[in-house]
Every structure is written in C-alpha cells, then in structure tokens.
UniProtKB/Swiss-Prot annotation:
Post-translational modifications: Cleaved by the viral protease during virion maturation. May cause the middle segment to be shed from the capsid.
Subunit relationships: Interacts with the peripentonal hexons as well as the hexons in the facets. Part of a complex composed of the core-capsid bridging protein, the endosome lysis protein VI and the hexon-linking protein VIII; these interactions bridge the virus core to the capsid.
Phylogenetic classification of the source organism: Viruses, Varidnaviria, Bamfordvirae, Preplasmiviricota, Tectiliviricetes
Gene: L4
Top-level taxon of origin: Viruses
Source species: Canine adenovirus serotype 1 (strain CLL) (CAdV-1)
InterPro entries documented for this protein: Adeno_PVIII (IPR000646)
UniProt cross-references to Pfam families, sorted A to Z: Adeno_PVIII
Gene Ontology CC terms: host cell nucleus; viral capsid
Site feature (Cleavage) residues: G111, R112, G154, S155
Protein name stated in the entry: Pre-hexon-linking protein VIII
Amino acid sequence: MSKEIPTPYIWSYQPQTGHAAGASQDYSTQMNWFSAGPSMISHVYGIRDLRNKVLMTQAQITKTPRTIMDPPIWPASMLVQKHATPKTIALPRNHTLEQAMVNCGAQLAGGRQPSPSHIDIKDTMLAGTGIQLGEDIPSVSWIRPDGIFQLGGGSRSSFSPTQAFLTLQQASSTPRTGGVGSYQFVREFVPEVYLNPFSGPPDTFPDQFIPNYDIVTNSVDGYD
C-alpha cells in the first residue's frame, strides 16, 4: 500500500539561475510505525492519497504546458513579466535660491538643497528595469494658486508648485527570457507525485530530481 501511495517530491529553487535544483521526498508525511495501529495506518493512507490527488490537480491548473519540465531557457511567452507601476518621487528644494530667482524674474526649473539630499530614489520596484520620465503631470492637488512662482511658459502662471515631483515609469524593452522567478516557480514546480517509483529500472528515475543534474548538458555531474 505504501508503494501505491508515494511520498511527493518537493522541488528546490536555484535563485541565481531561476531553475530547479533537484527534488527530495517529504519524509515528514511518513507514518510512525511504532505507535500506529492498523486503523490509524489505513486512515493516514487515505489522507496521503487525497493529498496526492490535490497536488496532481493543482499541477494541472497552475503549470504552464511544456514538453520539458525545466527548459534551459524559458521563452518570454512562458514567463510572468513584471510591469512596474509609475512611481512619484519628491525632489529636494532650495527655497532661498527659488525666491532669488523669482525676484530676478527667472523661470523656475528645479533647485537644490544646501546640504546633500537624503532622499533615496533607489527602489526594489525599479531594480533591473529601465526607467523614463513619466508622461503624466502631477495632480492639481499638489499645486496651489497663489501666483508666487512662475511655471514653464511665456506668461506668469496662477499655479505654483509647493513641491517638485518626478514621476518614473518602466521604459519599454524586450520581454525577459531565461529562468523563472520565485513567485512563478511555486506555481510551475508543484510537489511532484511520482507514481509507481519502484516499477522500472534505475535508469528510468527522473534525472531532474537529482540536485547536481545539469539541464544544459542533460547530464548528471559525476556520472556518465
């Protein structure tokens, strides 16, 4: 009975390459035979069988259809592409310089604080992606109509910003290819239910379950 209800293989993730790093059986689901009677053993087998059916159903729902479990290079069409939302950042201001420029009739185009800015525009949402200036202007709620500052244009504007803002958004680029991210890995590599594991010769065992299997060369390191 234990051979007919196999223990699932749990996949390991290699974040540097975005590929699977082998799979091992989840022995935490094994029965403690020293304290289990026939009734308890039968009950646990029923639970394990139901769990395996749930895992196989989940794999059919979340896995992307493919002929190779872990392709060396995942095409862009099979990868979840992250689309970063526009991010607005408050820029540093130099109010003394701005007032002096206004008094001289100059148009404002930014400014700088006397001390180094402590505003950090580095963000994990922008890591690894191109950025460009956003096409949208800041909300009118950020602008006050007191006529103190002059905006870009030939005549004096009745609107003046209380704070300068910069909007960044992801630049268009070629969709990413390669390995999967951690979020997609959980969906693609559901715990594997390997049915009838002892029904064939050893060479029929899936190589991709072995941690040192190389998907590029289709070989296991240290073995012919």
